[in-house]
Curated annotation (Swiss-Prot):
Originating organism: Geotalea uraniireducens (strain Rf4)
Enzyme class, first EC level, given as a word: hydrolase
Keywords of the record: Cytoplasm, Elongation factor, GTP-binding, Hydrolase, Magnesium, Metal-binding, Nucleotide-binding, Protein biosynthesis
Protein name, as recorded: Elongation factor Tu
Pfam families: GTP_EFTU, GTP_EFTU_D2, GTP_EFTU_D3
Major localization class: cytoplasm
Annotated family: Belongs to the TRAFAC class translation factor GTPase superfamily. Classic translation factor GTPase family. EF-Tu/EF-1A subfamily.
Taxonomic classification: Bacteria, Pseudomonadati, Thermodesulfobacteriota, Desulfuromonadia, Geobacterales
Amino acid sequence: MAKAKFERTKPHVNIGTIGHVDHGKTTLTAAITKVLAGKGQAEFKAFDQIDNAPEERERGITIATAHVEYETDKRHYAHVDCPGHADYVKNMITGAAQMDGAILVVSAADGPMPQTREHILLARQVGVPYIVVFLNKADMVDDEELLELVELEIRELLSSYDFPGDDIPIIKGSALKALEGDTGELGEQAIMKLMEAVDSYIPEPVRAIDKPFLMPVEDVFSISGRGTVATGRVERGIVKVGEEVEIVGMKATAKTTVTGVEMFRKLLDEGRAGDNIGALLRGVKREDIERGQVLAKPGSITPHTKFKAEAYILTKEEGGRHTPFFNGYRPQFYFRTTDVTGIVELAAGTEMVMPGDNVAVTVNLITPIAMDEGLRFAIREGGRTVGAGVVSSIIE
């Protein structure tokens, strides 16, 4: 069969499978492609094709991730599945695979397990906004009451991490049956039901271009007779010539007006998300603005120094530290375009952090940086990446 060309007319959503080892994440991923391939909406990917995912490098961290794509009547999906638990942790923290929603796979025979909890916590910390549950291996549980208890337990667990446990769709089924071609209630029908739940429960993400304007400053030039130009890649939103913007981070926030936008030496009316632009700024001196600051829509982002974060610390093999670090550790935090020194505070009861750990920390930066929740950063020592993190909440 020739590769079907995916129509880009449908809205695009990024999702992934999460959950405890051996609860059936990869089998479910394969089953979704199998069932949708039957409707001409996917290319079937066998379990082994997904399980032997190639390794990718994201910010110097090696992550094994499988990517599959498929579509429903309503949408086009990109779906990520990771073979190992450590890969999930790294993936979610680095944002290598940004998820608009996740399918939490729980084995009906076992109920929630330690990694089920950890993945829900990570989803909460790194800002995966919506979760749909697939209660897998339901054919292995004969007792209807037992199934109801497991469902109740999952709902309580989700609620305890601030997800709306009572409202989250839980679909019972057997990924293996569906993969083997079973057309019954727990087989193919369960997969179709799951996709309907994903379609209706996970909302369409707000596209980068629809968010308030933000551009990290990469470089600054003076153009004699014209003024100061800040260059960078527009991270989100649109900036039009004549609009007011704020310069945020590192110093007191200042307002200015964009009097020109250029790209590839051509003058434009506006710069949009994804564009590499130079923005000419009115009344700004060369020394008023520097790399590491951002240009942003006024009032849309503020500078902060203290925040809570979820971080993954690289192993020695990944090029990270060879030794643990302790409370008061002072590395550099690389936000967008610049390194800022910060002091790490470990949670009470945590003595030290070993290479390969993922950990919740509080960070105090020595200079304020424009940030909001969900912002990713690298942890570096003298230019070498030793960790990756994401801002989970801002303190001050």
